[in-house]
């Protein structure tokens, strides 16, 4: 991760950047091993891991602190991103998502009222197409392929004007070639807006592991 890398900015999508091969295949393998050795919960019908904060699944969907602290191996990854000048503020919330082939993510904004501007994602195990949508002034859709081991940044217009999602399918078509999806692990790094955290809601029920 300390090697030289090139950050590419998406054309006509202000605020989206991507670094291909931010981690090596060996680093990817070690990260996946650490992740799969950690405890999962099942929300949204898929497996996840939450660290430091999460928003509840039930109204009023409070942003709450949780006892699961950011593990050392992810903290080391954060420190490397700071050394590489990708970020200048240490993220304080992480979500790890597992996506099986055929699973997707409906178009959405990351909560504008709970999280700060910069969202960082690291994709492991498989690539995927991420789609961006906006309705005004005219409907538009953009597709960006996220290869495995890539790190991407969503901020500014890409964060606040464009919704993003992942179409649910078992392969993606890139330059006329069908690329099968495999199990993909997505690590998302955010900074919470501290004033929005509900410290009086400290109930964090255990959900189904596995």
From Swiss-Prot:
Biological processes per GO annotation: demethylation
Gene3D superfamilies, sorted: Alpha-ketoglutarate-dependent dioxygenase AlkB-like (2.60.120.590)
Residues in Fe2OG dioxygenase domain copies: 90-193
Molecular functions per Gene Ontology: demethylase activity; oxidoreductase activity
Entry superkingdom: Viruses
Name of the protein described by the UniProt record: Uncharacterized protein L905
